[in-house]
């Protein structure tokens, strides 16, 4: 395994590699993978954070395709072309807004990962990169979200050969710490 991270994106540092789950700190928009996951809002028409960055980088054709999808319910996922991104596809999923943990947020977040991975499998996507869904403006606690992400990815990969590799992309050191902690609990 000779410096695999340079194939994904120049300048992203590999943090951890456990079987088919890899953790990276860096910009998901620049990743050279088959698909990136967009932490979208229900309209799929762009917004702030990762969603806005993906829409800006992919170009105006992404917005035009998203308009034809008629939005996306929370916990579901839809797929589009990657347009100007290095990734061939964008899988858009709508995470839950944190409301204290008593409104089904955990299951909705788990569903985001499952539905995205199911689309990846169905489209024969070998490499996929996830941001930390719902942990930004939607306020989902980072460690709790990381535990859900890791458990859903692990469970799916145990039953499916595709995707071959799942990247969990952290936007900062604290985000990486949360994912590493969650991974250490399942080892």
UniProtKB/Swiss-Prot annotation:
SUPFAM superfamilies from the UniProt entry: Macro domain-like (SSF52949)
Cross-referenced Gene3D superfamilies: Leucine Aminopeptidase, subunit E, domain 1
An example Gene Ontology molecular-function term: deacetylase activity
Pfam families assigned: Macro (PF01661)
Signal peptide limits: none
InterPro entries attached to this UniProt entry: Macro_dom, Macro_dom-like
Domain Macro: 8-187
Domain of life: Archaea
Family (UniProt): Belongs to the MacroD-type family.
Protein name: Macro domain-containing protein MM_0177
């Amino acid at each position: 395994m000779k410096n695999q991270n340079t194939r994904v994106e120049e300048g992203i540092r590999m943090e951890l590699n456990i079987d088919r789950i890899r953790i990276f700190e860096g910009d998901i928009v620049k990743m050279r993978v088959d698909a990136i996951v967009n932490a979208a809002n229900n309209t799929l028409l762009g917004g702030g954070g990762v969603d806005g960055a993906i829409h800006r980088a992919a170009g105006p054709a992404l917005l035009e395709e998203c308009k034809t999808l008629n939005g996306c319910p929370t916990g579901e996922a839809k797929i589009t072309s990657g347009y100007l991104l290095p990734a061939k596809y964008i899988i858009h999923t709508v995470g839950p807004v944190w409301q204290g943990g008593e409104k089904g947020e955990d299951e909705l977040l788990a569903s985001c990962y499952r539905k995205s991975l199911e689309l990846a499998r169905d489209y024969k996507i070998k490499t996929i990169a996830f941001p930390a869904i719902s942990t930004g403006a939607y306020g989902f606690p980072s460690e709790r979200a990381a535990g859900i992400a890791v458990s859903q990815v692990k469970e799916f990969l145990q039953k499916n050969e595709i995707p071959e590799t799942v990247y969990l992309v952290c936007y900062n050191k604290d985000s990486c710490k949360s994912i590493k902690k969650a991974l250490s609990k399942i080892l």
